[in-house]
Amino acid sequence: MKNDKSLQGVTSIPGFKACGIASGMRRSGRKDLALVLNTGKNPVAAGVFTSNRFAAAPVLYSRAVLSKGATGMRSVVLNSGSANACTGENGLKDTVATAKAVGTALEMDPRQVLVCSTGMIGTPLPMDKMLSGIETAAASLSEEGGADASWAILTTDNEPKTVHYQADGYQIGGMAKGAGMLAPALATMLCVITTDALLDAETAQKALEVACAKTFNRLDSDGCMSTNDTVILLASGESGKVPSGFTAALTETCAQLARKLADDAEGAQHTVEIAVTEAENEAGALIAAKTISRSNLVKTAIAGCDPNWGRIVSELGTVPESVCPYDPSKVSVLFNGVQVCKNGAAWGSREDVPFDSREVHLEVRLGAGKAQASVLTNDLTHEYIHINADYSS
């Protein structure tokens, strides 16, 4: 069972309040609006956003606001149900109005507010419900509101994803959503991370970029990149600790959240780690691992508990030699520690491969060097098709 701090996520950290409410934006009546407030004396923010060219209005807005000044950033408002993507100028105006409403409700400059949305693309925000919901949310902020906030940002997720990490003299908490459209870069996901570490804006931004590159950008559930992917880091500075190893601690926190996202991938029965080892360089190993992770044939084989190494090497073979050099006659493949391919040919018995747990570890040894890289993915099942066929578009 999770400890209370882990369940609280963003509010497990000194200097933060949050809430999650049902504003009526979702027909189901479930929670759909979250608000996170940094009450610390030294507020700083950082952000990493989708590279999708159809980036949603809240992404464009938050990216622009952060670029003009991350110091003093105090709040994030997040809604589920409407992505506010591909909504034109009105969508951007609605995002600005959302930030202004939060600023008014919390008595702060709207430029201290970041905005995130998730849900249906092309659906305008129901601004009447959004604006009235913001007033309710502002009055509902609590130091114990992190759990409710984590529920309010979900779409097709089965459960919220929250973490708490105790570092040396400071803490990091977080919440994330995402079960489908998980693919670099980032990997649809929204994530808010909080810390009481004392950071400057440059340190926070650099640390977040490194952490995302090593975790969320190595998560590829279904090869589909969202228009709304956003990771926000808020630092309160309440610990007074200027950390020396913050990037490593933040990376571990993000890794825990990435694993939770993979474990809750739409319809998945297996969470799969694909490691490409003995590569000439890490960049090539990473591209090879990502290529294998996006193969529907590999993913369906794993869904059927079939250690089909032929599909793996076939996909590996599509990676250009200039990108990932290796000799096919030296490649080996292991499923859950059991070798099924050695030196580019069948080896051992596929029946020896255990598939008795959700976790599947796939290792591809290139025999070309000492570098390695890994990605997280999942299998592809009938349930994934049902979920996405039934999700209104």
Regions found by a protein language model. Give the residues of each.
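A structural signal for small-residue-enriched, beta-sheet-centric alpha/beta enzyme cores
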Residues: 2-79, 83-96, 103-393
